[in-house]
Amino acid sequence: MHVIVVGSGIAGLSAALTAAQTGAQVTVVERASEGEHGGNTRYTEAYLRMKSMDEVADDFIDHFMANAGGYTDPGIEQEMVRDHADWSPLARSQSMVDPDLLGAFADHAGSTLRWLEQAGLRFDFLPTAFITTTTTRLLPIGGGLAMVETLTQACKACGVTFRFETTARALLTRDNRVTGLATSNGDVSGDAVILACGGFEGNPEMLARYVGAPAINLRPVARGGHYNKGEGIRMALDIGAAPNGDFGSYHAEPIDPRSGLAEPAIFTFPYGVLVNKQGQRFTDEAPGTVDAHYENVTRRIYEQRDGIAWLIVDARIDDVPNWQKGSRTDQPPIKADSIEALAEKLDLPADALCETMARYNAACVEGAFKPLEKDGLATQGLTPPKSHWARPVDCAPFLAWPIISANVFTFGGLKVDRHARVIDQDGRAIPGLYAAGETMGIYYRTYTGSTSVLRGAVFGRQAALHASGRTQ
């Protein structure tokens, strides 16, 4: 048994190590050089939506199903309450969150983390960048970098062959079965191909085609995303794979565009005012806890002219305990002693910005400010409103940070089943082809936070187990 894995992030490395542990010959094909490999995983803190090492968070299933797709045909939805074996081809290939797959995701999450623990990783409930939270998050000690380095060494110890600086170009097929891979350094034949090579956040043409022309204002959240150019998705679609996930969307994160750090996130906007290039507010900065709502706020930033906004706070930001943990940029705030002076430094229309701030301050009311919980301290008579933590911003000095939407990963990918087998447009598994991580599509509308790394580990492992005949 020869298993070919494309990509070396958490999905690819989980697949490669699992396959090698079953006794398979394994080849990993990776575009990046050694030491630069690992895709997005290398740069992420790798939050995991778990309430313990063995159980997913209480809201795991509910959040996925609340963002399960578009307006699905009720007849197809009714099919999905039956046993998966009784689904029609239409139901099997439908673009939506597959409840059977979601059940497998939740069921295998704990055992996958225990397997990663056996491989040498350690996990704990460590502090996050979120000042206010709704759900629980487990983290690997050392973040995604520890995952990449630990699993790479484990793979090498098991005899896995790595072909770095090698790009996958196309799938090889015979008699409707995938038999190998065409690469930039020649063909590789095998019994199964596992596509774990990310989404298309590093491909401007695909972003413009699917997300839209304004995607020129998006950039990958970290260096690893630039390597994810969508070939894995494209080559599978070319042989009839069914698409899944929202191709027109992506996981949005608010970052400081001046910074070259990985994930230079700005999560402190609930305590200030967001304005666009016209010097106007455009969204509720604080609809709820920041971990649950930052993505929707960031999407509103992306919709503004040139996809940029500025967060403005005043000296009372220091009333928020440890607010700096929500500001991951290495760039200093822009400071001024008046709103007029700040407008000049930000190159914003001073009259408009002064009017915006005056209207906002006038709409703030007296009340208890509780920065570590939803306090209901809301503006009155202001459109758009601010639902929590609304205090006047009128105490110099004033501080500002630019914010854009980063593209953490794209939502569109391939339809897979609970074993990570790629499904074709007729609802059948394509023999010899699997997908995991970003290359598989499961997200619609709003991202179910802290599940992408977990998705990669779970379905990378499930793909390898099935390909090796060891299905759990």
Model segments located where?
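N-terminal Rossmann-like FAD-binding beta1-loop-alpha1 element of flavoenzymes
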Residues: 3-27
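Short, well-ordered coil/turn residues at beta-beta hairpins
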Residues: 7, 190, 196-197, 277, ...
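Conserved N-terminal/central alpha/beta ligand/cofactor-binding core
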Residues: 31-161, 274, 281, 287
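N-terminal leader/propeptide and maturation segments of large enzyme subunits in energy/redox metabolism
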Residues: 75-84, 88-105, 312-314, 321-370
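Helical element adjacent to the flavin cofactor pocket in flavoenzyme catalytic cores
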Residues: 139-191
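A glycine-rich dinucleotide-binding beta-alpha-beta segment and adjacent secondary-structure elements
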Residues: 170, 352-443, 447
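Glycine-rich loop(s) and the adjacent beta-strand/alpha-helix scaffold that form part
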Residues: 188-255, 453, 462, 466
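An anion/pyrophosphate-binding glycine-rich loop and adjacent beta-alpha core
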Residues: 225, 233-352
